[in-house]
Amino acid sequence: MPTVVNPPRDPNTLSNYNNWVSTHITANFDILFDQRKLAGSVIHQFRSTTHGESNHIILDTNHLDIGSVKVNGQPSEWEYLPRLEPYGTPLKIKLDQGVKLNEMIEVDISVKTTEKCTALQWLTPAQTSNKKHPYMFSQCQAIHARSIFPCQDTPDVKCTLDFNITSPLPVIASGLPVRGSSEAPKSDGKTLYKFHQKVPIPSYLFALASGDISEAPIGPRSVVATSPDKLGECQWELEADTEKFINAIEKIVYPYVWGEYNVLILPPSFPYGGMENPIFTFATPSIISKDRENIDVIAHELAHSWSGNLVTNASWEHFWLNEGWTTYLERRIVAAVHGEPYRHFSAIIGWKALTDSVEHFGPEHDFTKLITNLKGMDPDDAFSSIPYEKGFNFLFHLENLVGKSKFDLFIPHYFNKYKGKSLDSYEFKSTILDFFKDDSEASTALNELDWDSWFYAPGLPPKPDFDTSLVDVVYDLAKKWLSLPNSSFKPQPEDIRGLTANQVVVFLEQILVSERQLTPELSKLMGEIYGLAASQNIEVANLYFQVGLQAGDASVLEPTADLLGKIGRMKFVRPLYRKLAKFDRKRAVETFEKHRDFYHPICRAMVEKDLFGKKDE
C-alpha cells in the first residue's frame, strides 16, 4: 500500500510537522543583557505521526547559532538546508531509523540567538520609564519564534511548555509562575525563574520579558506587572474592570482555563498596542489613561484566551478565525459591561478602520479577502484591520442571520469542539452548518448564504445596520464647531459632559478629516473649554494636539513636544511628528533629536523616514 503523505496546510513553515508533532518543549535560557542574546537549550518531545516512514525531523530556524543536537541523549547528525526567504533556514536532524506511529523521541538542541533575531527587542535604561535598568521582551507572532529557538513554527501545532530562565532582573513568561521556585541569586547576581504552561499553545505564543518589573493584584486571579514607579497607576486603571470582563466572557463562552489572567504593561517606548501572550497579556502603557476608558485593549486580549489561544487558526491564511472571533467577543464583553449600544459604537469605529485598510491596499487586493493566499509570503505583510473587522462583520452577519439567541448556543459549542485544536475556515463552515442542521429556518439561511463571497471576495463586505445613537451626538457637535464663526453656537463645558473618551475621539476625528479647518483661536478655545490639552487619555490628547497643529495653534506646541518624549507607540508618534513638522519643522526636528534614544528602533526608523525621507535622497 503506497504511503499517503498529507502536505501541511500551513504554507509559512518549512518544518515537516506532517510527520512529527512537538508535544512538549523545555526552554532553558540565560538572558545575556550585555550581549543582547539568549543562550541555552531547548528540549522537544516529538511524537511520530507516521508508521516509521520518516527518518529525519525538519525544524524552522532563522539566524540562530546552533551548538549541538542530541536525540534520546545521543549526539545526532544535523545540517542546515538551503535558506528560503522569508522563512529562514530549515534545520534537518537525522535519525538512525523511523519511529513507530505515536512513539516519542526527545531532541535536545543547544542554541544561542544572534543580533539578527527578529523576535527580541532589547531596550536601554533610557528607553524605560524610571531609566534604571535594561529591559528585553519578545514578540513572536507571526513567524518570529524560529529566531529564538528551532521549532515547528506554525499555529497548526500546539505543545505544553516549561520555562527555566536565568536573569539578573525579574522575568515574565507565557506560563504560570512556579511560585516559590525562584532560587536565591547565584554568585553572578542572576536568579532562575520557572514557569509552566499546562495548556498546549502554538509557537507564536512563546513569550519572555525581563526588566525592572513589580507586581500588584488587580483581581482575584489577576496581577498587573510593570515598572515599580508606574505600579500604583496601572493597578488603579485595571482593578475595576478586569474581573468584570472575565466574568462577562465566561458567561458567553465557558470558564477561563489558564489559571491566572495577568497584564504586563511594557515600557513607554513599546511601539505597538498589545499581544495576547497566555497568562500574561503584553500591553502598551498608553492604555493607562487615568480614566479607565482605554482598556478595551484588555477586553480584546482577554478574549484571545478563548479565540486564538485555545481555538487557533491552522495557518495565517485563516487569521480571521483568531482576530475576527476575538473582536466579536471583545464587543460582546463591552455590551455585557456597558450596554448593547456600546457594541455598535465600537463596531462603527471598527468599520472606519476597515474602510481605511481597504483604501490602503486597494479594493481588489488579495489581502482584503477574508481568506488570503500566503504561499511564499511573509504573513506580517498581510497584517491589517481586515481579519479583525471583516471577520467581525462576518460573525455579526451570521448572528443576525440565525438570530442572537440561537447564535449564543453555537458559541460554546464551537469553542468546546476545537478546544486545544487548530482549524481552518472550511471546518468552521461545516461546524456551523452541522450545528444548525435540525433547525430548518437557520439551516436554510446558512445554506443559502453566499459563503464564497464572504471568504474570497476582495474589498468591503455589505455594511450592517448599526445603532448610531452614540455617534450621532458627536457628529452633531463636530458640525456645530465647523459652523463657527458663522453661527450662533456657543461652546460650553456641558457639550462633552457625559460623553465617553471614545466619543470625544470620534468628535476630534470628525474635526480632523473635515474640509473646513478651525482657526487657531477656535482650536485654543476648544482645548480650554473642554480641558482637552490636560487630558491624561493619550487617545484624546494626541488627537486634540493634531487638531491644534493642523489649525496652526501655537499653544499646543509645548504639550505636543512633551507628549512625544513620553510615549513611543507609533499610532500616536508618527502622525504627531508629521503634523508638527508641517507647522514648525525646526521644532519637530529638535524634539526628535532630543528623544531619539528613547524610541524603539522600528519607531525611530519610521519617524526618520517621515521627517527626512529616505537617507539617500
Curated annotation (Swiss-Prot):
<dbReference type="InterPro" id="IPR045357">
    <property type="entry name" value="Aminopeptidase_N-like_N"/>
</dbReference>
<dbReference type="GO" id="GO:0120113">
    <property type="term" value="P:cytoplasm to vacuole targeting by the NVT pathway"/>
</dbReference>
<feature type="binding site">
    <location>
        <begin position="139"/>
        <end position="141"/>
    </location>
    <ligand>
        <name>a peptide</name>
    </ligand>
</feature>
<keyword id="KW-0482">Metalloprotease</keyword>
<keyword id="KW-0479">Metal-binding</keyword>
<feature type="binding site">
    <location>
        <position position="300"/>
    </location>
    <ligand>
        <name>Zn(2+)</name>
    </ligand>
</feature>
<dbReference type="GO" id="GO:0004301">
    <property type="term" value="F:epoxide hydrolase activity"/>
</dbReference>
<dbReference type="InterPro" id="IPR049980">
    <property type="entry name" value="LTA4H_cat"/>
</dbReference>
<comment type="function">
    <text>Aminopeptidase that preferentially cleaves di- and tripeptides. Also has low epoxide hydrolase activity (in vitro). Can hydrolyze the epoxide leukotriene LTA(4) but it forms preferentially 5,6-dihydroxy-7,9,11,14-eicosatetraenoic acid rather than the cytokine leukotriene B(4) as the product compared to the homologous mammalian enzyme (in vitro).</text>
</comment>
<dbReference type="GO" id="GO:0005829">
    <property type="term" value="C:cytosol"/>
</dbReference>
<protein>
    <recommendedName>
        <fullName>Leucine aminopeptidase 2</fullName>
        <ecNumber>3.4.11.-</ecNumber>
        <ecNumber>3.3.2.10</ecNumber>
    </recommendedName>
</protein>
<dbReference type="InterPro" id="IPR034015">
    <property type="entry name" value="M1_LTA4H"/>
</dbReference>
<dbReference type="GO" id="GO:0008270">
    <property type="term" value="F:zinc ion binding"/>
</dbReference>
<dbReference type="GO" id="GO:0030163">
    <property type="term" value="P:protein catabolic process"/>
</dbReference>
<dbReference type="GO" id="GO:0006629">
    <property type="term" value="P:lipid metabolic process"/>
</dbReference>
<dbReference type="Pfam" id="PF09127">
    <property type="entry name" value="Leuk-A4-hydro_C"/>
</dbReference>
<comment type="similarity">
    <text>Belongs to the peptidase M1 family.</text>
</comment>
<dbReference type="InterPro" id="IPR042097">
    <property type="entry name" value="Aminopeptidase_N-like_N_sf"/>
</dbReference>
<dbReference type="InterPro" id="IPR014782">
    <property type="entry name" value="Peptidase_M1_dom"/>
</dbReference>
<keyword id="KW-0862">Zinc</keyword>
<dbReference type="GO" id="GO:0008237">
    <property type="term" value="F:metallopeptidase activity"/>
</dbReference>
<dbReference type="GO" id="GO:0005634">
    <property type="term" value="C:nucleus"/>
</dbReference>
<keyword id="KW-0645">Protease</keyword>
<feature type="binding site">
    <location>
        <position position="304"/>
    </location>
    <ligand>
        <name>Zn(2+)</name>
    </ligand>
</feature>
<dbReference type="GO" id="GO:0061957">
    <property type="term" value="C:NVT complex"/>
</dbReference>
<dbReference type="GO" id="GO:0006508">
    <property type="term" value="P:proteolysis"/>
</dbReference>
<keyword id="KW-0378">Hydrolase</keyword>
<dbReference type="InterPro" id="IPR038502">
    <property type="entry name" value="M1_LTA-4_hydro/amino_C_sf"/>
</dbReference>
<dbReference type="InterPro" id="IPR001930">
    <property type="entry name" value="Peptidase_M1"/>
</dbReference>
<dbReference type="Pfam" id="PF01433">
    <property type="entry name" value="Peptidase_M1"/>
</dbReference>
<dbReference type="GO" id="GO:0005771">
    <property type="term" value="C:multivesicular body"/>
</dbReference>
<keyword id="KW-0963">Cytoplasm</keyword>
<feature type="binding site">
    <location>
        <begin position="271"/>
        <end position="276"/>
    </location>
    <ligand>
        <name>a peptide</name>
    </ligand>
</feature>
<dbReference type="InterPro" id="IPR016024">
    <property type="entry name" value="ARM-type_fold"/>
</dbReference>
<dbReference type="GO" id="GO:0043171">
    <property type="term" value="P:peptide catabolic process"/>
</dbReference>
<keyword id="KW-0539">Nucleus</keyword>
<feature type="active site" description="Proton acceptor">
    <location>
        <position position="301"/>
    </location>
</feature>
<dbReference type="InterPro" id="IPR027268">
    <property type="entry name" value="Peptidase_M4/M1_CTD_sf"/>
</dbReference>
<dbReference type="Pfam" id="PF17900">
    <property type="entry name" value="Peptidase_M1_N"/>
</dbReference>
<dbReference type="InterPro" id="IPR015211">
    <property type="entry name" value="Peptidase_M1_C"/>
</dbReference>
<feature type="binding site">
    <location>
        <position position="323"/>
    </location>
    <ligand>
        <name>Zn(2+)</name>
    </ligand>
</feature>
<feature type="active site" description="Proton donor">
    <location>
        <position position="388"/>
    </location>
</feature>
